[in-house]
Amino acid sequence: MNEYVDNEARKVKLVGKTVTMAHGAGGRQTSELIDMIFKAHFDNPDLTADDAAVLTPPIGKMAVSTDGFIVSPAFYPGGNIGKLSICGTVNDLSCMGAKPLYLTSTFVIEEGFPMEKLEEIAEAMEKTAKEAGVRIVSGDTKVAGKGQVDGVFITTTGIGEITDGVEVAGNLAKPGDAIIVTGDIGRHGCTILLAREDFGIEADVTSDCAPLWGNVKAVMDATHELHVIRDATRGGVGTVLYEIAGQSQVGIRLDASKIPVAPEVRGVCGMLGLEPLYLACEGRLVIMAPKEQAQTIVDALKACPYSKNAAIIGEVTEEQPGKVVMLTEIGTQALLPQPGGELLPRIC
């Protein structure tokens, strides 16, 4: 039995304590760390039974995805590395048309990391996993020496069940497809940039980090005529569009006036000379589907949390395969530059 089931008593025990090398050595302190924090938030029969979870496989095809998270700072407006580690893998599965079912998680923790902060991370993971409808069924914890890790790094692996009748992939975009984004873009990247306090800029910007299976399911319930679903993480919407254009060997034409950007994000980008299209999102999707289905998809998205600002922002074309062209707000067309180099490191 877990002696730390009394939540208030458990939290009192964490005050002022830090993770030590002994917590990663496999002995009594390791068991205490697991009981005090991880079992308190992730406890379920699959997780606590043995070293590996024994699961019943889905009837149909499965999707598997893994992702590592090293975001800096680990805590930011709208989330933390724990919430992000659930959303990132859940969303990767969702973009394959797969209902997320199970997750595993690995923590690499720096010696001296505050227990209360680790508790906050685990609490966010528990809450987000419940919202996404997934169970954490296996995990591992390692402790690295001071300075060998920056705080805490997390890796999650997810398993999902592919929905019958849905096939989506980056190489399936077709000329004539409408291009949809599920909300205003660039929030997460802008939030992380401001949280680092390198520029002395203050703005009321919150990360869009969110689990998006519910949004994807709503779209699939509305229509199975879908070609591409991608989450616009590192490199933002612009990078994702270039990847799809290359994979499908199609051209992409965007309408700048239709791309939703929050005023506060646009303001920060204006001051720093950044393009919102290249800033990461952690709660936004890019969807490509026949234009006849576009409004149906947007209507379905607007009925869901996290996608009230969904919009049709462009179309897939036969011209200039592999390129992304922008129709500017003054009516001219410009080739969108393909991003390269280090855009914004450690945003996820």
Show which residues each predicted segment covers.
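Helix-biased detector of long, well-ordered alpha-helical tracts
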Residues: M1-C348
